[in-house]
């Protein structure tokens, strides 16, 4: 995908949301793309799903507001804009933004990436099906990746929170 395609895709996007948290963090969280709340605030994961994400990582002693590399998380998305009608990013959009995501990862140098949902699994692992992938360590962009259910999914399917807790505990074990 050439730069002309990137420029065309970004031309009509009013808000570009890149990252939040301490770039020195050992853990990078990669979401799918901004939603309505993120579009309004200009930061990733600020709506109900973001509040759940904060509670999830607080349960293992991590926070997006900490400057301590050992206690912080760094958050970004596969695509930095809200797709029209809040749809999932298309395969073309994912492929278009993949070089930027890879470079972002290379610059941040996380020890672990948490891939939140199908779109981030597709981008990082080139696989879909977070239900099958979750709970198993994989490698993406040269970094250990833990696929997890997206917090928005957990809000719709509270019974999956038990599996998400197991995944968080695996992340906690890996960083100790």
Mark where each language-model region is.
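A polyanion-binding, active-site-adjacent surface
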Residues: 1-176
């Amino acid at each position: 995908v050439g730069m002309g395609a990137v420029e065309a895709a970004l031309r009509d996007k009013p808000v570009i949301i890149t990252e939040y948290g301490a770039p020195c963090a050992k853990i990078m969280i990669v979401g799918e793309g901004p939603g309505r709340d993120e579009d309004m605030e200009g930061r990733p994961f600020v709506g109900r799903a973001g509040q759940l994400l904060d509670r999830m990582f607080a349960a293992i002693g991590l926070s997006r507001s900490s400057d301590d590399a050992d206690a912080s998380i760094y958050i970004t998305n596969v695509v930095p804009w809200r797709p029209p009608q809040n749809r999932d990013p298309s395969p073309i959009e994912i492929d278009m933004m993949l070089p930027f995501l890879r470079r972002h990862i290379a610059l941040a140098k996380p020890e672990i990436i948490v891939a939140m949902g199908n779109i981030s699994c597709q981008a990082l692992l080139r696989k879909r099906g977070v239900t099958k992938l979750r709970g198993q360590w994989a490698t993406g962009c040269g970094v250990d990746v833990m696929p997890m259910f997206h917090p928005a999914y957990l809000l719709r399917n509270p019974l999956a929170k038990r599996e998400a807790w197991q995944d968080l505990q695996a992340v906690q074990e890996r960083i100790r």
